[in-house]
């Protein structure tokens, strides 16, 4: 029978280290690096003792700023075993974002690698943030701007002034008695915060979402159950670990099912195909653009994908044609998960047994042990079947809250315990949900409510349009007017009159975009989400440059 577990992340790791000690857990196929459950658990214990040696304890905030490197998960579980909180840092962050997060999270220890995108020099960014580091003895950092910050660890063998490296942390751990580690482990409770993730800031400043062992291990377990995972599965993980998709839907699924996690350090379609082929992976995750890159790779046909059986496509609307190609060419029954970081993250999911139509056109049903409701934002009442409202969730997966921000927490979790997603959705007769837009994205033009998603989906039907976003542009006359931001396929030429002609007579006049902008890209967050709230400013700036009068 399916039930929620009160095991901590450390308990789960030790369970498999005892039950299946010699089974492979973490595999980096490209470098033939392999850890069994027993080996990995031992490395985690050594790292946990090393963290204790540098003053990390229960409740301490430890940042991990790295791609999917082998010791990323070692640090996550080492924190989990001693009750510390792993703060995941987006690898796309630049100086200002890093400083904001370190300050806001009261970070004590920061673990880094050097950036893998030519211009991202994490080491120098850290020195710019903590100039005292270059003249400090390791472990004795005193920063004026970041008084909580005491240590920086470089994940790897390289040595940098003022920073520990991994080998030194493991060595320091040898001085810590096993009893001290056991004592620290004994104090950890499944309802303690284990992971803090910063929301990507689609609506302003990022907030630290506090997630517990209970939140994420159970969400990962149920995600795996929806795809009928067993300990025989091998999941290829090419999505970033700093995001819920990687650390919960992937890592926690493997942790709670005792299966093998085949890691890809940084997304590369060729490396993904080679890893699936060589390791005989049974499942693969990705966002639509990743699957497109894999399918379109000129060497795709050289690899055997027949071992695959399932996986998750998430992150944005999954195109029907892409789903079909993945099922035909990669032999996978693709499922999708809808949620948000604040819901650990999964709220609804399609199941492997669902029909293609359900898996392709909906985000499935509620997760077990949760209550998902579509609520009318005006009245607070539950909407009838087929009527659009706000997607809300109550259950084991609701975050503990935003770090040091009770006001923002109270804004999203109501007095009945429902987490308000800010997303609009509808429920059908079978209990499956469709996401229809964002409440905050809604355009109010002269009293008419306009949902951008509806216009976007309509414009997608026009040949030549690769991507489109619709947002409100301030209007003196109507309050807001409809603005469409369009990316065209390569080689396609189109003007605003073509767009209006296409709309004419097919959608209501007030929904036809008044402002049409042809752009090369949209403003994005570090984790690849479109920042719709910035489109308004982009539109105003483009109007100014093009001499368009806003009325």
Model-predicted segments: where are they?
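AMP-dependent adenylate-forming
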Residues: 12-36, 156-160
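Conserved pre-ATP/AMP-binding loop-to-beta segment of ANL
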Residues: 21-24, 145-149, 153-160, 164-198, ...
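Conserved AMP-binding/adenylate-forming core of the ANL superfamily
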Residues: 25-77, 94-99, 103, 165-174, ...
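Conserved AMP-binding A3 loop
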Residues: 34-38, 185-187, 191-218
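Structural core segment of the AMP-binding/adenylate-forming
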Residues: 82-171, 490-492
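AMP-binding/adenylate-forming catalytic core of the ANL superfamily
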Residues: 93-103, 114-115, 284, 395, ...
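Gly/Ser/Thr-rich phosphate-binding loop
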Residues: 171, 278-286, 295-358, 371
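Conserved AMP-binding/adenylation subdomain of ANL enzymes
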Residues: 217-234, 242-283, 291-293, 297-299
């Amino acid at each position: 029978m399916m039930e929620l577990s009160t095991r901590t992340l450390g308990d789960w790791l030790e369970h498999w280290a005892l039950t299946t000690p010699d089974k492979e857990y973490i595999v980096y196929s490209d470098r033939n690096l392999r850890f069994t459950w027993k080996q990995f658990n031992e490395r985690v214990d050594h790292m946990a003792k090393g963290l204790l040696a540098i003053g990390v304890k229960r409740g301490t905030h430890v940042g991990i700023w790295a791609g999917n490197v082998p010791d990323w998960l070692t640090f996550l579980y080492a924190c989990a075993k001693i009750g510390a909180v792993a703060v995941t840092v987006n690898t796309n962050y630049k100086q200002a974002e890093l400083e904001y997060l370190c300050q806001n999270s009261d970070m004590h220890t920061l673990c880094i690698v050097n950036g893998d995108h030519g211009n991202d020099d994490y080491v120098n960014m850290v020195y710019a943030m903590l100039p005292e580091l270059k003249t400090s003895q390791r472990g004795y950092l005193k920063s004026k701007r970041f008084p909580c910050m005491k240590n920086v660890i470089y994940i790897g063998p390289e040595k940098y002034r003022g920073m520990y490296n991994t080998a030194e942390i493991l060595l320091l751990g040898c001085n810590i008695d096993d009893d001290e580690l056991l004592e620290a482990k004994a104090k950890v409770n499944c309802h303690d915060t284990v992971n803090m993730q910063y929301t990507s800031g689609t609506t302003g400043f990022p907030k630290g979402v506090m997630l517990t062992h209970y939140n994420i291990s159970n969400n990962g377990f149920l995600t795996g159950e929806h795809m009928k995972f067993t300990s025989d599965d091998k999941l290829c993980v090419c999505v970033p670990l700093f995001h819920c998709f990687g650390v919960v839907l992937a890592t926690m699924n493997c942790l709670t099912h005792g299966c093998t996690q085949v890691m890809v350090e940084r997304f590369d379609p060729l490396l993904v195909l080679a890893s699936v082929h060589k390791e005989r992976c049974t499942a693969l995750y990705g966002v639509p653009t990743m699957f497109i890159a894999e399918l379109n790779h000129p060497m795709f046909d050289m690899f055997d994908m027949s071992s695959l059986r399932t996986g998750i496509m998430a992150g944005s609307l999954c195109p029907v044609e892409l789903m079909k190609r993945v099922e035909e060419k990669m032999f996978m029954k693709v499922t999708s998960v809808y949620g948000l970081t604040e819901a650990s993250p999964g709220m609804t999911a399609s199941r492997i047994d669902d029909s293609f139509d359900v898996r392709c056109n909906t985000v499935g049903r509620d997760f077990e042990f949760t209550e998902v409701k579509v609520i009318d934002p005006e009245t607070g009442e539950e909407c009838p079947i087929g009527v659009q409202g706000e997607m809300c969730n109550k259950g084991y997966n609701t975050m503990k809250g935003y770090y040091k921000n009770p006001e923002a927490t109270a804004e999203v979790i109501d007095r009945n315990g429902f987490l308000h997603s800010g997303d609009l959705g509808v429920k059908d007769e079978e209990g499956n949900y469709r996401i229809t837009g964002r409440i905050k994205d809604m355009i109010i033009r002269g009293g008419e409510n306009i949902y951008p998603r509806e216009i976007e989906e309509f414009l997608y039907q026009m040949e030549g349009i690769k991507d489109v976003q619709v947002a409100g542009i301030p209007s003196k006359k109507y309050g807001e007017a409809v603005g469409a931001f369009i990316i065209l396929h390569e080689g396609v030429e189109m003007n605003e009159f073509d767009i209006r002609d296409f709309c004419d007579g097919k959608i209501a006049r007030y929904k036809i975009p008044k402002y049409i902008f042809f752009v090369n890209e949209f403003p994005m967050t570090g984790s690849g989400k479109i920042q719709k709230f910035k489109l308004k400013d982009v539109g105003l700036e483009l109007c100014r440059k093009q001499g368009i009068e806003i009325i």
